[in-house]
Design a protein with these regions (language model features):
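Non-catalytic alpha-helical scaffolds and adjoining flexible linkers that form interface surfaces
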Residues: 1-20, 25-255
């Protein structure tokens, strides 16, 4: 059976002298593994359609008895030149691909998550120099949590329904169990969570509701970047019941 779908290439590895095994995220079939024969040959018919972070229309031979499918054809439909030529954009896209690889189960589709990823890739390729492209990695994580059923609330307490105003306190408690910032009068003793300063809460509120152009236009300090990165990886680990440690960090940062 031949299946065709929109796909984003996540990563791959060599398989024989001329072939590759690739992991891709498709819109309607979720994450799948494919074998691309001849893709490493100088005469490959695939061109750049199977390169990492490429958005391509993919056709493959599907079988219910296999979990590795043979590629029939692939054609790139979203250019990536302005991503590949900009290191900051490229690092952000690789980080997003890493999240899709580690959080998504095989053949479990989330069309809205695919559309968000494609939207970010399109935005990066159409835009010129961005002030802080890596901010969109955090936006992506926030939206991914929502798609996976454990979205976060940074504007309202999930217990009281009270709106969170960063002017009310220097620090706020985020409950991992409730998935939200808690009102100041809620007793959080014994709850698993993290104390966030008002600056970080303000950043998370912006990243949660802002447009891509706005979210990539302001700087986040190195210390706040590490705090947000650690906070989100812990949150995903708790709700997915497996540890996530994403290795791709913003330019100049290491973990």
């Amino acid at each position: 059976m031949i299946r065709t779908d929109s796909a984003i290439i996540l990563h791959g590895r060599k398989f024989s002298d001329t072939s590759k095994i690739l992991h891709v995220y498709t819109r309607n079939h979720g994450k799948i593994s494919i074998l691309a024969k001849g893709v490493r040959s100088s005469k490959s018919k695939f061109g750049s359609s199977l390169e990492v972070i490429s958005c391509s229309t993919l056709s493959w031979y599907h079988s219910t008895q296999k979990d590795l499918y043979l590629v029939k054809s692939a054609e790139q439909y979203t250019p990536t030149y302005h991503i590949l030529s900009d290191y900051d954009k490229l690092i952000t896209c690789i980080a997003i691909a890493e999240v899709l690889s580690t959080t998504q189960e095989n053949e479990e589709s989330h069309p809205e998550l695919f559309d968000l990823t494609h939207q970010i890739l399109q935005f990066f390729n159409k835009s010129q120099i961005l002030k802080s492209p890596y901010n969109l990695f955090f936006t992506f994580l926030i939206k991914t949590a929502l798609c996976m059923g454990f979205g976060m609330s940074f504007h309202k307490c999930n217990i009281t329904g009270e709106l969170i105003d960063i002017r009310d306190s220097e620090y706020f408690f985020f409950s991992y169990y409730e998935g939200s910032i808690l009102s100041l009068d809620v007793d959080h003793s014994g709850q698993q969570g993290i104390l966030l300063n008002s600056s970080i809460v303000s950043i998370l509120q912006k990243l949660d509701t802002g447009l891509l152009d706005d979210n990539s236009s302001f700087n986040i300090s190195s210390s706040d970047t590490f705090t947000i990165h650690d906070f989100l990886s812990r949150y995903f680990s708790i709700h997915s019941h497996k540890k996530f440690t994403w290795r791709t960090m913003p330019p100049g940062a290491t973990i």
